[in-house]
Amino acid sequence: MTINHFALNAVDRSAELQGKGASRRLRKQNLVPAIIYGGGEQPTAISIKINELVKSLEFEAFFSHILTLNVDGEEHQVVIKDLQRHPAKGFPMHADFQRVVKGQKINMNVPVHFSGREEAPGTKAGGVLSTLVTDIEIVCIPSQLPEYLEIDVSGMEIGDLFRLSDITLPEGVVIAELELEDGHDRTIVNMQPPTVEEVDEAAEVDAADVPATEQGTDESKDGE
């Protein structure tokens, strides 16, 4: 397995009883229950070795790549659509995979990378770059699925903002929100002015501003 290709082995569990009890038994065997659906076929219940899945989850690209699931020797091209983790320990408890059909568009959430923040004039002027998204839902055919969307913020001044429609998209890729009739072109990053801390002027009175009589009184006390 490389970052550009993810392959997992799985076992078909469709013939077995499903449910919470069955899922618990699989987890006790260090297996993660999962399901494959879509592509005009019936859903298939499967299990994956937890160590294999955890290793793949270490890569951000796993969530935005076409994956290969080898189910009892039969390969399935899929994308991961949902992952349930243990609320406290974080290990995977269940996964949903969607079959990929060649030439058929899919909806996927892909990560967003912001580049050039240190070079931005706004940053150099003390501004704060505020990023409002970590991923964006896109629509495209499987062969055009990008690993991530990169947004160059190196030209942002204080007060500038970046909207969904400002993103330079790869060929064949559209943003799902902008395709909706009621979709709105929301802000995804902006450059805010420097944070100014309010100073308690009463506590910052300069000694030079204190009347001479008061200074003399303090000095006389120090000399006693």
UniProtKB/Swiss-Prot annotation:
<feature type="compositionally biased region" description="Acidic residues">
    <location>
        <begin position="197"/>
        <end position="207"/>
    </location>
</feature>
<keyword id="KW-0699">rRNA-binding</keyword>
<dbReference type="Pfam" id="PF01386">
    <property type="entry name" value="Ribosomal_L25p"/>
</dbReference>
<protein>
    <recommendedName>
        <fullName>Large ribosomal subunit protein bL25</fullName>
    </recommendedName>
</protein>
<dbReference type="InterPro" id="IPR020057">
    <property type="entry name" value="Ribosomal_bL25_b-dom"/>
</dbReference>
<dbReference type="GO" id="GO:0008097">
    <property type="term" value="F:5S rRNA binding"/>
</dbReference>
<dbReference type="InterPro" id="IPR001021">
    <property type="entry name" value="Ribosomal_bL25_long"/>
</dbReference>
<dbReference type="InterPro" id="IPR020055">
    <property type="entry name" value="Ribosomal_bL25_short"/>
</dbReference>
<feature type="region of interest" description="Disordered">
    <location>
        <begin position="195"/>
        <end position="224"/>
    </location>
</feature>
<dbReference type="GO" id="GO:0022625">
    <property type="term" value="C:cytosolic large ribosomal subunit"/>
</dbReference>
<comment type="subunit">
    <text>Part of the 50S ribosomal subunit; part of the 5S rRNA/L5/L18/L25 subcomplex. Contacts the 5S rRNA. Binds to the 5S rRNA independently of L5 and L18.</text>
</comment>
<dbReference type="InterPro" id="IPR020056">
    <property type="entry name" value="Rbsml_bL25/Gln-tRNA_synth_N"/>
</dbReference>
<comment type="function">
    <text>This is one of the proteins that binds to the 5S RNA in the ribosome where it forms part of the central protuberance.</text>
</comment>
<keyword id="KW-0687">Ribonucleoprotein</keyword>
<dbReference type="GO" id="GO:0003735">
    <property type="term" value="F:structural constituent of ribosome"/>
</dbReference>
<dbReference type="InterPro" id="IPR020930">
    <property type="entry name" value="Ribosomal_uL5_bac-type"/>
</dbReference>
<dbReference type="InterPro" id="IPR029751">
    <property type="entry name" value="Ribosomal_L25_dom"/>
</dbReference>
<dbReference type="InterPro" id="IPR037121">
    <property type="entry name" value="Ribosomal_bL25_C"/>
</dbReference>
<keyword id="KW-0689">Ribosomal protein</keyword>
<comment type="similarity">
    <text>Belongs to the bacterial ribosomal protein bL25 family. CTC subfamily.</text>
</comment>
<dbReference type="GO" id="GO:0006412">
    <property type="term" value="P:translation"/>
</dbReference>
<dbReference type="InterPro" id="IPR011035">
    <property type="entry name" value="Ribosomal_bL25/Gln-tRNA_synth"/>
</dbReference>
<keyword id="KW-0694">RNA-binding</keyword>
<dbReference type="Pfam" id="PF14693">
    <property type="entry name" value="Ribosomal_TL5_C"/>
</dbReference>
